[in-house]
Amino acid sequence: MTIILKPGSVPLETLEKIYREGLPVRIDPAFHAGIEKAAARIAEIAAGDAPVYGINTGFGKLASIRIAAGDVATLQRNLILSHCCGVGEPLSENIVRLIMALKLVSLGRGASGVRLEVITLIEAMLEKGVIPMIPEKGSVGASGDLAPLAHMTAAMIGEGEAFYRGERLSGAKALGKAGLKPVVLAAKEGLALINGTQTSTALALAGLFRAHRAVRTALITGALSTDAAMGSDAPFHEEIHQLRGHKGQIDAGRALRTLLEGSAIRRSHLEGDQRVQDPYCIRCQPRVDGACLDILRQAARTLEIEANAVTDNPLVLSDGRAVSGGNFHAEPVAFAADQIALAVCEIGAISQRRIALLVDPSLSFGLPAFLTRKPGLNSGLMIAEVTSAALMSENKQMAHPASVDSTPTSANQEDHVSMACHGARRLLQMTANLNAIIGIEALTGALGVELRKPLTTSAELAKVIAALRAKVVTLEEDRYMADDLKAAAELVADGTLSGVISAGILPDLEA
């Protein structure tokens, strides 16, 4: 299946499908005429006498140096090679595929001036599985993601490295094995390919998609913990949330209320319970998870706009002029990444407190210490809770905003930068930590509910426990725990736990 992209209106749902499924993409042929028109205009400018940045001049601080017409192709090639300065481990294939798809969307708007053959090469590389090796570090998020995108482009011109069928090869060899030929870049094409926010945006989108799946699963594990602790569902009453009015809180409260519907555990303590109120980690879940959902939705709107944006420089305007601007500055992406980081941090923080509540017999309303029937002889989930605390603390440190930092670069020509790329990249580690925290809560919540037998939980939560137990059997005696934690985290990450819940209960990104 090939996804057909309509530049300017590609929805988040399609972007997530590209990220998760690695499907090939193509630009809608209806956009080809606009692409070719802009390319023809760039060719005219390159043949003329007027200096235009990046077409017949140097780059950055060297923009005042005029380049002879005969050196334009060399200029573009040198640009790519000199900017391949990335360091660190290669970005994953699914991230690079999304970067390439986003670059197609941007170029497909017909304002960048690249020829159609550049577009078709990217499409063919995605179809045949030639994935450029892009090091993870080296971008400050303005002037675009220069180093990462230079590594992408290097493979296109037969330089650098690329992955093909599991092998890491030279760019030329990877293209050759796939039956493709490298492109010789024309005027502005190198600049159009490396100038842009596609790396930062792809990383931020990956963080967004992972965080959204995590918050949906955190609502499930939060409901499990509520039932395991014999907590009240009264704070999830619809009218309470309507009186405050925040959409995320309303949606989170509705989800929790529905997930707990029909629980025999809840019915068992509707009367005679001397506790007046539950701790905040139980009672305030809709307020915290709902606030996180709201800022994820805000970030989603920003990133959907950016994914469809033209962010290179200069741009070919509708009147045919090539005008220098600054759409490559990734400040919107940096802000969105910081928002996502805050949400990821707080989802994990309140989840961790529920884990701590369930393993503490002074708080868990009758559950045995560390959820083991033989405390002392067995330690149960004691250290699983400690691990969740370590991960929570690490995420708090990583949640410091990246966008508040800036440093002058390129001889002060690029004197304010966004730091969007590493601000977005940290989301991969943060969401991995979050998945592990929520996975641990799934283990504690499920075991806590099982220890309430013969009382039973709701039908929805019973499906979640069954999905968990298909991979992780109930803890009766101490055993090697690392495999349990890994399996539980994977069930969060791959959507297994959220996938068993009936449609319409868990909130979507698009409110």
Curated annotation (Swiss-Prot):
Cross-link (5-imidazolinone (Ala-Gly)) at residue(s): 142-144
EC top class named in words: lyase
Catalytic reaction list: L-histidine = trans-urocanate + NH4(+)
Entry comment on modification after translation: Contains an active site 4-methylidene-imidazol-5-one (MIO), which is formed autocatalytically by cyclization and dehydration of residues Ala-Ser-Gly.
Cytoplasm listed as a keyword: yes
GO MF annotation list: histidine ammonia-lyase activity
Keywords recorded for this protein, A-Z: Cytoplasm, Histidine metabolism, Lyase
Family of this protein: Belongs to the PAL/histidase family.
Protein name: Histidine ammonia-lyase
Origin species: Brucella canis (strain ATCC 23365 / NCTC 10854 / RM-666)
Source lineage: Bacteria, Pseudomonadati, Pseudomonadota, Alphaproteobacteria, Hyphomicrobiales
Gene symbol of the encoding locus: hutH
